[in-house]
Amino acid sequence: GDLPIVVNPPRKAKASSDFRFFCDSYFPLTFSLPWSDDHLKVIARIEQAVLRGGLFAMAMPRGSGKSTISECACIWSVLYGHREFVCLIGSDEGHAMDMLDAIKMELDGNDLLLDDFPEAVYPIHCLDGIANRCNGQLYKGERTHIGWTAREVVLPTIAESKASAAIIK
């Protein structure tokens, strides 16, 4: 069948180049407190690195949201096609796996992402939490090639999607 329509095109368009707006709009329960100056600096550096390229290291106190902001940056960068491949690096393998699990939970359970990114998120929702369905999933007669493993996520291959076949590992 057809993909659902985008519920809020203006919101989706604005968030394309505004990482803070993306976080506030699509993760309102996660980012319910006001941003600190340090957070705003980190957000600006992430935005610059994703949109224009580059690397940076982020150091903030424990519990200040480093992992959560990083997870949302991964989602933002692939959904808009800013990046085709994102590598998560945690303090150890377990932490990196936890971060990937958090990203998978958002892609599978965040209704705001489903509303505005049906081309990337709707096929994931159609799996109904059963990863084995990835292999047989079709869209318009073509396989979506979703990857949904413990170590990586491959977003569905959909011709009109900027996130088509993006990888988070």
Predicted regions and their residues:
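Short, well-ordered loop/turn elements at secondary-structure boundaries
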Residues: 52, 82-83, 163-165
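Contiguous, well-ordered alpha-helical segments that form the cores/surfaces of helical PPI scaffolds
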Residues: 43-47, 68-79
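Walker A/P-loop
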Residues: 52-72
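Post-Walker A helix-loop "phosphate-sensing" segment adjacent to the P-loop in P-loop NTPases
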Residues: 77-85, 108-112
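Residue-level preference for the first positions of well-ordered beta-strands
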Residues: 55-57, 85-87, 167
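Conserved nucleotide-state-sensing and coupling region of NTP-binding domains
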Residues: 89-169
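N-terminal accessory segments
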Residues: 1-54
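A short acidic, glycine/proline-enriched capping/turn motif at secondary-structure boundaries
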Residues: 63-65, 75-76, 93-96
